[in-house]
Amino acid sequence: MIHNISILGSTGSIGRQALEVARNLNLNVVALSANSSIELLEEQIREFSPRLVAVSDKKAADELRVNIKDLNTKVLAGNEGICEVAACDEAELVLNSIMGIAGLEPTLSAIKAKKNVALANKETLVAGGEIVTNLAKKFGVKIIPVDSEHSAIFQCLQGCNDKKQLKRLILTASGGPFFGRSLDELKNVSLEQTLSHPNWNMGAKITVDSATMMNKGLEIIEAAWLFDMDIDNISVVIHKESVIHSLIEYVDNSVIAQLGVPDMKIPIQYAITYPKRVKSC
């Protein structure tokens, strides 16, 4: 199991939960990055003592330098700084939970530095799937999915040695907070209702995307690149309880599924400890 980890997007929902896992596993957090939430980032720095941090917002980075001048942590700024954190020498694994397309370039930087990547940034593969997967093959790097559905598929595939035996991948979807509502009922839903996911505790953007089902469309593309699968062989089924996270079906019509409580710390921890499993927090 790894001992040193870098976490990109450490002040977001996945990043905060990743730090909980790192704390429970007693990992050495060598580098962190954030967009602009320097108050929380400072708390994280003072607890985990990373050697390197980066802040996208350059003004916020300047402020952070002043706030932690009593510490030995180096503060970098801008996208260049984020990419430097992604390629940090000491890190054995880079967990990328940056939101949106901003996560693509740091992923590429980590791969070029020959770092295995725990990927929670689906836009990396939606926008640059061919580039990322080809580069990972070139540098001998593993891309380990953190999204619960893709982590489930990844786990189900551990016993599959021949892709030709696969018939299809089956992603599950809760349907979000508005499943079963009519088009007329959807006209007057509020932001508060949209952000009230029935099962998962997630960031605002992905919660909205889940409510509209847009997130599932992105996940199909992500799965196609992660598992080198034709989109026609990827299905989606509604499973409101979010206990079955995803399934794989073989050509003999047998099905293997991965189940668990809807807690993102479980796939986060599996990505960090892979191929081992340890007691969860």
PLM regions with names:
Residues 1-281:
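Catalytic, metal-anchored helix/loop core of enzyme active sites in primary metabolism
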